[in-house]
Amino acid sequence: VVLKQSKSPDITETVIVDLTGRSSQYYDPNTYAFDVAIGGLPFLLNVNDTTPYRRSTARWKYERVDQAREPGEQTLDSGLWVRSQTSFHLGEGVQYQEALEGNAEQLRFRYFTGQGIDPWTPGQISLLKDTSKIFPAATSSSGRVISLPATISGVDYVLHIDCAAAGSTAVRVARVAADGTATSLILGSALSTEILAAETDGTTLYLATATYIYDYDLTAASPTLHAHYQINTANATSVVLQFVKNRIMAGVSYVTGTTPVAAVYELPFAGGHGGSHTNLSTITSVANTTTVPVGWIWSDIAEGRGAIYVSGYAGDKSAIFKIAPDSTGALGAAVSVADIPRGETVRSLFGYLGTYLAIGTSRGVRVAAIADDATIVYGPLIFNTTNPILGFAARDSYIYAGVKAGIGGASGIYRIYLGQLLDDGTYPYATDIVATGTTGSVDALGFFPTSAQLFFSVHSSGTYLEHATNLVSEGTLQTAIVNWGTLEKKAWKRVRVETGTLNGNIEIYADANEGRTQITTLTTGNAYNTDFDLSGAYASTQVNGQLAFTLYRNADSASTGAIMKGYAIKAIPSPTRSRLIQLPLMCYDFESDRRNTRYGTLGGAKFRLSALETVESNGATVLVQDFTSGENFDAVIEEIAFTRMTPPSGTYENFGGIITITMRTVV
């Protein structure tokens, strides 16, 4: 019963709430039988038809307007959140589809990882070409293999060079055509020792061993191996040969007595392919190339705009030098142009178009830009590897790098696209062709000039060639993780996949916390722009969504296979819902609780309202105790409205009425 007429307080009535300051937000209900307490302030409810108790779900989703240059995923309101990809041409290497760092416009064309997939045609993914070992056909090479391109009498070949020391009947150098037809050029009877380096200038093959540098005329009717240079009186421990700026350059490391020596030489080969050999000690090395740390190994040589570049390392220290020719063609001194981060060593160099210098290191690949003055500025690692990068090739807008055991555990090629610099200073990349079942280092790679077929050599295996038409049997692409940049859980609903008429099957998988689950198979001969249910894969709400697509080659034609245009994954966020609770509270000077116990004090209503408004102003979370339902929860006061129900009476203010309080639960 509410006592709406105020009177002088009786001595038996006590102040049940200390309005001068509360020591706790918890109210002990064992004194008076109140209905609720808010932040330690107790109240009775005034629930009736006019002032009901209201409880509703707080708004948890807000309208969004897609203001991108093109209409996007949020423009169309299907009630679901959508993340789609219509192209993959900026390659792999991103874990999250949302831009935690970098450019969102670039991330929308990238994916997490792939194998056997060609993403480089905008608007689709397809299968890569297959590979086969062309030499040796029936056996495997016993060690390091160097493969070099050569065009002899108008026919393209691969020069397959087995580097390990071998017996007299072993084939050390073979000329191999694209169809696998092989001709032995040099046998072990002519050269039995280990080959340390090999290079061609288009017509002559150069080979280096620990004691000699040989030349071999590829165009002669009956060529013979000729020892042109003897490597001093001390045997070389390592040699690198490269044909750059129309000259053969050699980086040689050897030991004189107990002193390691390293030097770079320009090697004149005037006088044809016969005659006596010349001792390398009679050739003046390039200035400054001997003043390197003890134990230095020259690892590679390349050319760029206005200079020759040489790389080397000793221990965990590595550097790149430039050697610039003057107007007469004479070489100047070597000048350091790049120090590599300690612990990372340069193992290969490749100059392309006079503008780019690919740097293969013990940790991966970097690409440097070559300035007009031949200085270089290199970027971060484009991709990381656990084994050194030992060789490169290039064609059109791409650089290709050989990777040991780096594609599903097998050795093969990574392709780097130079056509677009990414915001993080790297270039797009993706895995390319692979030598299935091999794990050796990729020692060399190149292209058949006419057919543009890529070949590469694998340590302890042989030379592999990209097939002219046949595709790999299958390839898989795994998308980046989708979570819309929020850690709220989502109910993953559907995936839409678009294809043309398929020439091979496509299997769709979802990667969830429970593991990978196959969603469906798209079959040959059908075209799709279809939604598929994901509920079987995502049994519970989860933060992240991720898909994988496996494309298959046609069962009847090895030269055709599946092509996928894009996908869209759809989900609805499932955050823990907060509630809006509206309570009508009695606020009079004198009231009676649910046990009909009378309590109150003159002016108590105004004090209680003021105390509640102070709690609201503080903006803090308050404990709400509902003694009618036994529910306790934390909430934030969103609104307090007071309606006065009693007029002044005599000399008393008679302040009292109904407080309507709106609170949002905190979840």
Locate the predicted segments by residue.
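N-terminal beta-propeller domains
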Residues: 3-188, 199, 204, 208-220, ...
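Non-cytosolic beta-sandwich-type ligand-binding/adhesion modules
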Residues: 3-17, 27-28, 32, 39, ...
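Repeated scaffold domains used in trafficking and secretory/extracellular systems
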Residues: 138-155, 190-203, 230-246, 287-304, ...
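Beta-propeller fold detector
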Residues: 183-189, 224-231, 275-288, 331-339, ...
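Beta-rich globular "head" domains
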Residues: 251, 489-500, 601-611, 617
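Loop/turn-rich, solvent-exposed surfaces of beta-rich toroidal or solenoidal domains
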Residues: 345-366, 383-422, 488, 494
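Extracellular/virion structural assembly segments
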Residues: 572-667
